[in-house]
Amino acid sequence: MKQVQTKRDWKKLAYDVVEEKVITKEDAIAILEADDTEILEIMNAAYIIRHHHFGKKVKLNMIINTKSGLCPEDCGYCSQSIISEAPIDKYAWLTQEKIVEGAHEAIRRKAGTYCIVASGRRPTDKEVNHVIGAVKEIRETTDLKICCCLGFLNEDQAGRLAEAGVHRYNHNLNTHVNNYESICSTHTYDDRVDTVQKAKQAGISPCSGAIFGMGETIEERAEIAFELQRIDADSIPCNFLVAVKGTPLEGQKELTPVECLKVLAMMRFVNPTKEIRISGGREINLRSVQPIGLFAANSIFVGDYLTTAGQEPTADWGMIEDLGFEIEECAL
């Protein structure tokens, strides 16, 4: 006889979290394993937590890809890696003028945070100086919050970025430590954690998340959320694998929209006070249920990603308005 699974009281669990009770790994796994028919109850419960901490505000972020491709790392998901055969644009560093122009485009798109991203293992000191020059001009001419994602950092580089006015540094954990060697062999999971810690020690707000759908188990998916809690990431981008043709993971089965919603809800339960951002793969994986994701998440990227297209900013603005939510400048 098939065992009947006991239905959880998701709303009670949400109020427990609001009252600052820490949920267990078993609770997180239960969210991920719940029957699909419970998804609206789960998202409603996640919204209780989201609304308590963030109301109806949605933070918009914009990415600029300042250096594309030409990366010596072999990350299996990435179209910019040395082993990728994906047909992407490849170029060296954009000029400081172009980076500053991008900041003004971010403002036109109603973004409060501008994310300066560059491919590669780690920046040289000269490259850090190049970014710092642009950051200083952006800080002098706009009210944007600035996030950088430049690869591995040493302590001196992190300190200089902080001094220049970089508010946030993104360095994703990407996947579970047990799954890491199957995704990348040119650096380790611990290398990534180290850079997050260096940024935090320099006084920069840490941004770190994962790419879901790269072969991790349900249990590992939950443990990623608790690892992000442990390293105290202030902003958590939840990416969903886009199986790009020409990369080693091109044949990987992508998550269903409901699986993505469960990830977002679980992440909100485990990290209730943190910025949860629906990131890469939003349009492709969530598809028509994108708006429901914002009942757990409180942040999205507006416009294109690094090498994949996003939807038009007007579509995102309309989605937010239709939900009765409102755009917030990303105060840290």
UniProtKB/Swiss-Prot annotation:
Under SMART domains, the record lists: BATS, Elp3
> Is Aminoacyl-tRNA synthetase among the key words of this record?
no
UniProt cross-references to SUPFAM superfamilies, sorted A to Z = Radical SAM enzymes (SSF102114)
Pathway, per UniProt? Cofactor biosynthesis; biotin biosynthesis; biotin from 7,8-diaminononanoate: step 2/2
Domain Radical SAM core span(s) in chain numbering? 53-282
Q: Where does [4Fe-4S] cluster bind?
A: 71, 75, 78
Which EC number(s) does UniProt give?
A: 2.8.1.6
Q: Which PANTHER family match?
A: BIOTIN SYNTHASE (PTHR22976), BIOTIN SYNTHASE, MITOCHONDRIAL (PTHR22976:SF2)
Describe its assembly.
Homodimer.
Database matches in HAMAP family = BioB
NCBIfam families given in the database record: bioB (TIGR00433)
- This one is known as Biotin synthase
Gene it is expressed from: bioB
